[in-house]
Amino acid sequence: MKKSSFIILSTLFSASVMAQSWPTQTAESKAGTRWWWLGSAVDKENLKWNLHEYAKHGIGAVEITPLYGVQGNEKNNIPYLSDKWMEMLRYTEEQAERNGIELDMSTGTGWPFGGPWVSLKESACRAVFVEKAISGNTLIDITPAEKDAKNAFLHKVMLYAADGTATDVTQQAKSNQLVLQEAQRGAYKVIAIFIKYGVMKVKRAAPGGEGLVIDHFDRRAVANYLKHIEQAFERTKTPYPHTFFNDSYEVADATWTPSLLEEFEKRRGYKLEEHLPELIAYEPKVLSDYRETLGDLLLENFTNQWTAWAHSHGAITRNQAHGSPANLIDCYAAVDIPEIEGFGLSNFGIKGLREDPGKTRKNDSDFSMLKYAPSAAHICGKKFTSSETFTWLTEHFRTSLSQLKPDIDLMFCAGVNHMFFHGTCYSPKEDEWPGWKFYASIDMSPTNTIWRDAPFFMDYVTRCQSFLQWGEPDNDFLVYLPVRDMWKKNINKLLMQFSIHAMGQLAPEFIQSILAIEKAGYDCDYISDKLLAKVSVKGQQLITEAGTHYKAIIIPSGTTITPELKRVLERLSPYVIYGEDTQKMAHFAQPEEMKTSCGLKLIRRRNANGYHYFIANLTANDVEEDVKLAVPFKDAKWFNPLNGEITDADIDDDGIEVNLRSGESMILQVFNTPLKESENACCSNEDKQDEIEIDNSWTLSFIEETPHIDKTYQLDKLQTWESLDEKTRTVMGTGVYTTSFELKKKQLDANWYIDLGDVRESARVYINGQFIGCAWAVPFILDTKGTLKAGRNELRVEVTNLPANRISELDRQGVKWRKMEEINVVDINYQKTLYDQWKPVKSGLASKVRLIYK
């Protein structure tokens, strides 16, 4: 192989090779965060301070979501959409602009959309079926059961004869009593439909936002809801936000809407009311048609209307479609920024990554789930795919920066390029620690100890997203989403919600298809019937209406081919693959050996100069292999998103050397033409050296700590501090480890890295007074960057721990810090609990520190 130097390119590049530099950073390439306003009890001084802190630490967008308040703080609560609330919003907009932060807001408080201005008849509703045998009676009582009777209104009464005929007898029902005519006594069954309104109230609502959830399927209900919000903006002359947000669809009891029967007949070509026995019995065809109709209404009356409304006011929409009883691809495609969600912590077995048994929950968003929103974005030419990121990774106060990286890397590989933390609570600067908290948050805020080194994580995200937002998607295949096969499934209820937590049950066959395609070395995007109808063949490829190219479309095994789908596929022939046929896949596209040989996760994008990859080693193995790429190239560069370094790649023909330790990630850019040689480039002739263990005595002191510790500790060997004494057992903050070591002149010929081993939880490192970087993710290894010298070298390592030991001490002392209203603070299983029994969490340097040759 051609050996190229691994040196940062510090010279300015000419215009012809500017692609070798990092893409321009924007507010969108920075991390965003969901910003909870508890009780909307905000004030201008603290808004200004909070936004400045966020900007200083690298946050580029905030999304205001008002929630319930703080106990004893009721006098400071500000009712949602009141003149005072709108004044605070205007001030926030001004301060956000000054700090270079984009301002988004939820289109309501808590979730889902709703409030006190939603009338009963425009609220979410469900069908109550009253089924009675006739048995020769002429008077039938069709009164709903007591539990269903409140707010239930008679909608339709149908009579069913033994020969299958159905008769509408609604007009014969009075006061829940059905009077049959003599000729009708031969029928065997009557089914009455009542519509029960008000089946859900806004969850976690803020003051002024309490009330009924809207009927998402009803156009007028949605329009009236949005009109009320619009009036507040117009009344107060407040500028609209950059983006309106909608959280995942969680109206589990909404199975009906007043126009459903009419809309069903219009769309499906027959009357649903004539087939209620089949619907109640979950007969596949009727059930599927019912579910498809609800999906159509949600898309048209809610998603499309909401987006059009936002556009009419100069704003855009960001939407979580998951949970919807609709084709997710169509719902994601209907908005400006589709958003997926992570829920829990993935376990990849990465070497050296902290584990916390019993204090984490499994990630329900596997790789196949994460690809729904990016698929819609790619197919429709949308620049951004966002994510609700790090929801419920661990118990409160126990989430480290190192635990964040694998899951954000997985999201990046799925196609996410505009992440939002879940999230950040507005908290007054002077509020006693731990301040205001939201129960399902990693707490990316100034009140968390990880905030000190969070800018280094933010830099990582920004560098990754700047590349992932650049260029165009380059996935190999489209994959048909067989949603009608899913709709036919009997899950013992009418409504089928495609939620993160349910996909394993609803779509196991589809998930296996996606994993098989991934294992074969390819990448794909999911497509719906609606979007597939607009795909054409051009230049021996499939091209979407937005201009995105694919090699072929894969029809997953077991998919029902309807006549309509058959006609579309015939038009796209021969670029159709039935089943997970890897030989046919290889006929259309080259697999990526980084996937098949190394087990790496990656995503590839096209740009004007070639291609670029984001690559993550989410395995327990270190990878050092020569691999062939699936795309042609003449030259290549590695971009390290952890530290910003740009280095030459070792290449040979269409192959490249890949070196990634367990947990590491890199960006690879390959070019269509050879690059000019850098004046700084030279081949390395360094001799490999043995590692050097820094095993001298250490000193340990503390900065920015609570409670304050004056003492300096003398350590014969490295150890974490929670076991030193009672004070260190409960301290949160930064411990400063210092030592010195000797090097001989000949040892300086090596390119040394410092390996900190097991860090709890992040560490800033200084050698001879020079800052060399922050180690916040595994492996905790940093380049010494020429700071070493012959003779005595001074080493300073500033380690910041988690606040877990401090909060457990507050619980032992009986401090009332759980002061939020409503759900307050619960554990990962949504149970109220104390942390007083927590064992001390390791804090500091937990293993040997070495100099290694890399």
Task: Tell me the role of every PLM-derived stretch.
Residues M1-S21:
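Bacterial Sec-dependent N-terminal signal peptides
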Residues Q20-A61:
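Mature N-terminal segment immediately following signal peptide/propeptide cleavage
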Residues A31-G32, D43, L47-K48, A61, ...:
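Carbohydrate-binding surfaces of carbohydrate-active enzymes
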Residues L67-S175, L180-Q184, V190-K203, G209-I214:
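Acidic/aromatic-lined carbohydrate-recognition and catalytic surfaces
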Residues A149-A152, K156-E234, D652-D690, A790-R792:
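Extended acidic/polar, glycine-enriched regions
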Residues L675-K676, T800-E809:
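Short acidic/polar inter-strand loop motif in beta-rich domains
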Residues F741-N768, A775, L795-V799:
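Aromatic-lined ligand-binding clefts that engage carbohydrates, nucleic acids, or primary amines
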Residues L782-R792, P803, I852:
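Short, surface-exposed tryptophan/glycine-enriched loops
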